[in-house]
Amino acid sequence: MGIHPLTSRCAGRTALVTGSSRGLGKAIAQRLAAEGATVALTGRTMDPDPKYQGSLRETLAEIEATGGSAIAVQADLSHTEDRERLFAEVVDRIGTPDILVNNAAVTFLRPLADFPERRVRLMMEMHVLAPLHLTQLSIPAMRERRRGWVLNVTSVGGDLPGGPPFDDFDRNAGFGVYGTVKAALNRLTKSLAAELYDDGIAVNAAAPSQPVATPGAGTLDLAKTDTEDIELITQTALELCTGDPATLTGRIAHTQPFLREIGWLS
């Protein structure tokens, strides 16, 4: 995470960030905590494990070492019961979230002709149903406060590809199901933003304009593509999780053009 001036933009607020043991979720959780939020971390990896890069305990320790406030709750968000248990524990320990960041994901890349149905269902569960369910659980308290922010972490892979002619990536990379679930998440974001607008709840999505070199990017050959600094997604997330819900909602924000639009990036 880069060095940021402390502005306390999230002081007094609580945030739930899914998939925060590593990668984008970890970086977003750290940024919100640095801005004063009390952050609930969640993911499947609670303790350090040599099979994985990062764990909830490590993220928690790093936040607390810099003076931030956080808790860690292990959960497998592919299961309805785990989502409900997670949310209940977060409410019990730090209160209902003012900010919900739906970042947890699972990715399999394979041609559609032989893509296993069980993996399609798992990706739909993680990328679409889990964000919807956690948002549904968050809505009552946000409505009562007439204030709330929901951020769905999406991907430029959710954009419709051009063609014909189709480029080599779209023909051969096996991104069909991934792009489908991210496109569905984008549509869900727009619909939630419209339905919750009168309640003062902002719902947005954010995507890196280019791949970010994190442990979660292991399926990509980053040596063959341009990458961007993780600070761009953390800044985008901060803006979308603190902006005025009357004007900053319903956005599918790609980091670089969005940050140029608001004057943060030249």
Regions found by a protein language model. Give the residues of each.
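Conserved glycine-rich cofactor-binding loop
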Residues: 14, 21-22, 45
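A short, exposed helix-loop element centered on a Lys and neighboring polar residues
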Residues: 135-136, 190
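Conserved Rossmann-fold SDR core element
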Residues: 32, 96, 150, 186, ...
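Substrate-binding pocket helix/loop in short-chain dehydrogenase/reductase
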Residues: 111-112, 119-121
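Conserved glycine-rich Rossmann-like NAD(P)H-binding loop of the short-chain dehydrogenase/reductase
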Residues: 35-58
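C-terminal helical subdomain
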Residues: 183, 198-199, 205-206, 222-266
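Catalytic loop of short-chain dehydrogenase/reductase
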Residues: 151-184, 189-198, 210-212
